[in-house]
Every structure is written in C-alpha cells, then in structure tokens.
Amino acid sequence: PVINTMFAFAKIRGAESIYDTKGGLMHGPGGESYYAAIWANDQAEYINPFFPYLGYEVGNRSALCSYEHFARFMNPEYKPLPSSIIAEGIDVWAGAGDRGDAAMVAYGASRYALSKGDKAEAEKLWPLIEWCLEYCRRNLNKSGVVASDADELENRFPAGKANLCTSSLYYDALISAGYLGKDLGKPVAAYARQATALKKNIDRYFGGTVEGFDTYK
C-alpha cells in the first residue's frame, strides 16, 4: 500500500503541470509556478515515454510537442541540440554545452513512439531519432564511446570528456530505434551492429572494480 500510494502521488506530480503556451503544450516539473520551458532530460528523456502508459492525452500531446520543438534544431552540420527550449519556445539555454542531449532525445523519442503505438506519430518522429543517433555516432571518441562536454548534472560533479550516462542512453536508443524502425519498415541493421560494438566499448572504457564489485565508473 505504501508503494502504491507513493506511485499514485508520483503520477499526479508528473502530470499536474502542463501549460498551454504559445509554443504549444509544455510540461513543467510540477508545482504552481508557470514554467514554459522543456529540457532534453526532464521532458524528452524522463517523463515523455511515461505518458502513453498513463493514458493521459494531454501528456501525450505535450510529449509530441516537445519533440517537435527539438526537431527544429536539427541541422546538416550536426551542431549540438540545445539543452533546453525556453520562453514558450522562442529561446534556448545551452549553458553547459553538450550534455549528451541528442542521446537523451533519441532514447526518449524512440521509447515514446514504441509506447504510444501510433504509426503516424512514429513516422513524424523518425527523422529526429535518425538525426540524434547520427549525431552520437559522429561524436564517438577513439575508444568508441560518446564524447560530450558534460552529463545531466551539468558539471556539478566531474564527468570527464565522456560519461557513462550519455553512452548508455545512446546504446538504448540504438536498441529501441531498431525495434521501432523494424515496425516502420526502415533499414535498421546498422543500428544493431553499432549497439553491439558500443556495448563492448562501454565495458572497456567505463568498466572497473569498486570495493571488490565489478561495476562501472
């Protein structure tokens, strides 16, 4: 009962603050403050893939809206996506550099599309997913893991030039995009090969022993 109650409150907290802005429906972190901004982690990665399970159509619409905002920043030069799209969609924040934001969006958009099960929406999201995966591929370092300026903690703690979180998100995005692309009839064999190689590289680069336990660092 305690866990059920906690989860019930979490569902309310996760869905209570969605604002109808001039940039469309935008999900906020909860509470009573008007917060017309979206993040590659808070919305694209965390809450959006959950909304289809909640069955809350306003949440689903806000999720699609957020991905459409990030899709505006795809570019042929493969410059980083902004970390946050603010002020009802008319400005951005990228104060921590590349936090692995493309990996966050690729993971979240793939998971959202799989969970929602709407083919038309999935087709709309597919170019964004492809772009984000290609961005990550282009930013692999010599060890075959994704390089970035920071992680989601934005340098509150040292993250080095490559971090486990970003490469793990990219790995899951490759797997999830493979499932999604298969349903959509897209060529996805390369994603499976890239995921296999990335898994080995993650183990080599981040694997370690901490206090006698085989883990990651």
Residue ranges of predicted features:
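Short, glycine/acidic-rich beta->alpha junctions
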Residues: N41-D42, L128, A162
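Aromatic side chains
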Residues: Y34-Y35, Y112, W126, Y135, ...
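Conserved helix-loop functional segments at active or binding sites
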Residues: E16-D20, R72, P76, R111-L114, ...
